[in-house]
Amino acid sequence: MQFYLILLAILYLIVSFISIFKMEVVFTRILRIIMGVLLLFVLALTTMSFPKENWWVFIVLLLLVGNVEVTGFKMLKKDLKGVNILNLMSLFIFVIYFILTIVLF
């Protein structure tokens, strides 16, 4: 279960990196948003069967998806300083998500 939840987040981050920095077309932006929504939906359904304490994993992943979408917006506006700060925040949020997933599941 831990591997599954961590792998989904890593795949989302890879797709987001490609759509934000490498392939700047509308189609990849739409796919990134759809994948983020589906990731949140799958994680919400997965954590429904666990105690309330495990909802922290969902909240942290929600913050990660929101941060990635803000990064995409900042990259669209060519704010490189903001993008660098948001990339560091995304890395920090992913580390927190990783630790919570290992500890709670």
Curated annotation (Swiss-Prot):
Gene (name only): mspA
InterPro entries in alphabetical order: MspA
General function of this protein: Plays a role in toxin production, resistance to host innate immune mechanisms, and iron homeostasis.
Name of the protein this chain belongs to: Membrane-stabilizing protein A
Free-text disruption phenotype from the record: Decreases cytolytic toxin production, including alpha-hemolysin Hla and phenol-soluble modulin (PSM) toxins, perhaps as a result of repression or lack of activation of the major regulator of toxin expression, the accessory gene regulatory (Agr) quorum sensing system. Reduces abundance of staphyloxanthin in bacterial membranes. Significantly more sensitive to treatment with detergent, sodium dodecyl sulfate (SDS) and more susceptible to penetration by the DNA-staining dye propidium iodide.
Lineage: Bacteria, Bacillati, Bacillota, Bacilli, Bacillales
Organism name: Staphylococcus aureus (strain NCTC 8325 / PS 47)
NCBIfam families noted in UniProt: memb_stab_MspA (NF038247)
Subcellular location as annotated: Membrane
Chain ranges on the Cytoplasmic side, renumbered to this chain: 22-29, 77-84
